[in-house]
Amino acid sequence: MLANKTALVTGSTSGIGLGIAKALARQGANIVLNGFGDVEGPKAEILALGVQVAYHGADMSKPAEIEDMMKFAAERFGRVDILVNNAGIQHVARVEDFPVEKWDAIIAINLTSAFHASRLAIPAMRAANWGRIINVASVHGLVGSAEKSAYVAAKHGVVGLTKVTALENATSGVTCNAICPGWVLTPLVQKQVDAKAVALGVSNEEAKNVLLGEKEPSMQFTTPEELGELAVFFCSPASNNVRGVAWNMDGGWVAQ
């Protein structure tokens, strides 16, 4: 379905981003990976799916590096047809105790990077009259949770950016939608599980159940693979008139 198209996925060396990158690769899209940590492993996983893969290590808090990444992708593959804004970090603290530098970093990486990547991708998408921007927001783009002020603010901003981007391109072949996962057992969430296990003096498995029980009625983690299939749908002809939605995959979290 996506042969001869290129997908750039930020924050894609692990977790949700890698799951989405692999799902798009299975549909034939060439992939530009971005992120920190192990790079060769994810590249090998994508190559094994029979597509081309490239990597750019842009720091998503730095606009100049984002611009370099977008230029790199265009030079390597012609243009970015599918942009998945997934890069994200987390910090937990009460508002009055929240470190200012952590606030600034979360807003920069979780929200502002999506703006910069989108503004740079849209002109070529519009020229081709086809493009997909998929913003990985969060259930926290729809509801709040205590001690996550920066993350919740950023993800609400991502949902707002999604709506505006969709409206501005509504008469073109360029769509923009957001994915809003509940709990996904990524390295980011595993840190929260570990902290809860220590705080409660329980096993890691018990801490996972406590975490799910607080918010997610299904008592199941959403998987990167499931989120990847939703991204594939957003890239399919069936989604041509799906524009500006914030699609939650959250086990019933916001239905309560």
List PLM regions with ranges.
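Residue(s) in the substrate-gating loop at a strand-loop-helix junction
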Residues: 138
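Conserved glycine-rich cofactor-binding loop
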Residues: 6, 13-15
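Active-site helix of classical SDR
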Residues: 118, 154, 162
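Substrate-binding pocket helix/loop in short-chain dehydrogenase/reductase
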Residues: 66, 94-95, 102-107, 133, ...
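Short, small/polar-rich loop/turn modules that mediate ligand/substrate recognition or access, typified
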Residues: 170, 175, 242-244
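Conserved glycine-rich Rossmann-like NAD(P)H-binding loop of the short-chain dehydrogenase/reductase
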Residues: 27-42
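Short C-terminal tail/terminal secondary-structure segment
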Residues: 3, 143, 232, 243-256
